[in-house]
Amino acid sequence: MAGIGFELKKLFRRKGLFASLRAYGYAGIICTGPMLLGVLLQLGILLLCSWSGAPRDQQDLLVCMITYTLLFSLTVTSFFSMPVTRYLADMLYEEQEQTILPSFWGSSSMMLVLGCTLYGLFLLVSGATLLQGLLCLWLFAEMIVNWNAMSYLTAIKDYRGILCSFLAAIALAFGLGFVLVVLLGCPVLEGMLFAVTMGYGLMMVWDVVLLYRYFPQSEESPWAFLRWVDAFLPLAFTGLCTNIGLFAHLVICWAGPSGVQVKGLFYGAPYYDVPALIAFLTILVTSVNFVVSVEVNFYPKYRNYYSLFNDGGVVGDIVTAEEEMLAVLNRELRFTALKQLFVTAAVLSLENTLLALLPLGFNDLMHGYFRTLCVGYGLYAVGNTILMILLYFTDYGGAVAAAAVFAVSASGLTALSMALDPAFYGFGFLIGAALFYLVTLFRLDAFTANLPYRVLGQQPIVAETKAGRFTRLGLFLKHKKRKPTKSAKHSAS
């Protein structure tokens, strides 16, 4: 990601409003692509449905289906995302580009089999019609491939291609939805769901074409990445727990007193969901700042510090490099927190004016949720930035512990808040995000207080190779692929 930051930094140096907008567009899409695309499509769908005069129950069911599909796909990919990214980084560092495409299809296949099986079972009993269920499953499969492809696309630094695929997906979804629903009078639910599916499908094809343009095809095993899942299992659970903490409060509200049964197993809480989606956009500034400022300024000091250990630097130089690195880190984290505080305060001050421009029907309760969740998402954004720094220092244990605290506290406190007045529903997530921020902050402070010991004393004397269930699964799949069939044996004889 630091390499991405350096490339984006070049764009920010260019003069002019258009250059700045393009740089922020690249950074925003790269950092928060999946959720940003989902939020924009949700808001656009609501606007199109209101223009077409669609019944409220159809709008609610459409939003529920897309939201369920989005959150389920992000949950499945969250477990594999960090280990796959680590595998990708290692292979690029070792100049093993021939392993990239096989690992992409291997990881995508693994997530598709697991995710489509579970989500397909849910759709069978959800109350959706056959056509609606097939469209949801189709959309889910496209999202899995798209979210996985984002990790690989950032490696090739083709930000224009990423931006174009992103914009093309939105344009096709909105344009096709307008034609089908508004002009041709197709059923709102099926027409809009098909349009969104086509939009994500275009993005998927575009991204895969980009990958094939940059990485060579080969006969390498597509399951080699599974060894990295075993070796970096804390990374997998860090991603999963962070995802649970980020989205569990939505699901709990659906099942709570404010939840509404839209159809079958599809529940929603419109008064809570819409403010949550819009409040999520306020963390964009911190996500962008982390890549283009924190990492760009911190990484050279970080690299210099660790190179002194690898290249036999003297103690005095190591101590000086450590002081410089931590000074830059503290400064950048402080600036990040201040920027997020400024954005949150500005949004809270202008929210009545800004939200009045959108035909979303905000009432006093929704305004309260929006303010509460803006603060919660702001704390999460800063805490997540510190979590990334813990991963820089390979404090995987501290990172997974902080993510687990976030998942348990945000989920548990939101569940407890269901017994309170509806005005307090967002406070469970806010307190969970605050705990997440405090745990990551204290853990980073404790970890860096004795950094030389962490670098040298906690490393294993002998290199360890972890061969767990995922490694054995990879070997099994690799062996099964190479095993000749009976017909092949007969023809050979």
Segment roles from a protein language model:
Residues T67-F72, S108-V113, L121, V125-L153, ...:
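Alpha-helical transmembrane segments of multi-pass membrane proteins
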Residues L153-V179, L390-G412:
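Alpha-helical transmembrane segments of multi-pass membrane transporters/permeases
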Residues M1-L41, D60, C64, L226-L235, ...:
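N-terminal membrane topogenesis motif
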Residues A195-G199, M203-E295:
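Transmembrane helical elements of multi-pass membrane transporters/channels
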Residues S20-L36, L163, S221-A248, L333-F342:
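Hydrophobic faces of transmembrane alpha-helices in multi-pass small-molecule transporters and flippases
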